[in-house]
């Protein structure tokens, strides 16, 4: 798997060859974040949420906790870069969704373009939020893959195809 930032056609973009994320695709960030947080909430309620599919792979619950933490860190970073007041740290996925939506909804054009200070290279607030969206969407993919692995391991084998 490879993901990262690339300068393509005068624009800095985030790409992932595992989940297919491509920040060049036009998206409504508010709607994309909302849909992703809904998916995470649903996946967090799965009967296998507390089980790890493999010893080194997080459970659905652990991924959801990581997503709350990642949203908290990124929103705090972007608030700081945009000169906005700190927000209350989220304690739940719904808090993280609300805080992320508030930031996306309230940023001005100039604030979207403000540079952040978390990377050793230039990353705007916009790109930091795009990175957060990728991280969250990728973890939806990770959780679903983990649940499928658990079901394959638990079920009575009828047929298996491997690639």
Predicted features by range, described:
Residues 98-101, 126:
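Amphipathic alpha-helical hairpins/coiled-coils and adjacent low-complexity
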Residues 1-16, 47-88, 115-163:
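Short, contiguous alpha-helical
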Residues 15-26:
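Charge-rich, low-complexity N-terminal segments
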């Amino acid at each position: 798997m490879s993901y990262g930032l690339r300068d393509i056609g005068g624009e800095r973009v985030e790409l992932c060859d595992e989940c297919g994320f491509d920040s060049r695709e036009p998206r409504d960030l508010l709607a994309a974040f909302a849909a992703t947080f809904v998916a995470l909430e649903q996946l967090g309620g799965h009967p296998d949420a507390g089980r790890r599919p493999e010893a080194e792979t997080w459970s659905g619950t652990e991924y959801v906790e990581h997503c709350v933490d990642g949203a908290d860190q990124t929103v705090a970073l972007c608030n700081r870069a945009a000169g906005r007041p700190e927000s209350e740290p989220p304690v739940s996925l719904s808090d993280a969704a609300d805080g992320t939506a508030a930031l996306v909804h309230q940023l001005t054009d100039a604030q979207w373009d403000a540079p952040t200070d978390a990377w050793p290279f230039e990353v705007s607030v916009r790109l930091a939020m795009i990175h957060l969206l990728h991280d969250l969407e990728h973890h939806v993919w990770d959780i679903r893959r983990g649940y499928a692995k658990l079901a394959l391991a638990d079920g009575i084998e009828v047929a298996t195809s491997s690639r």
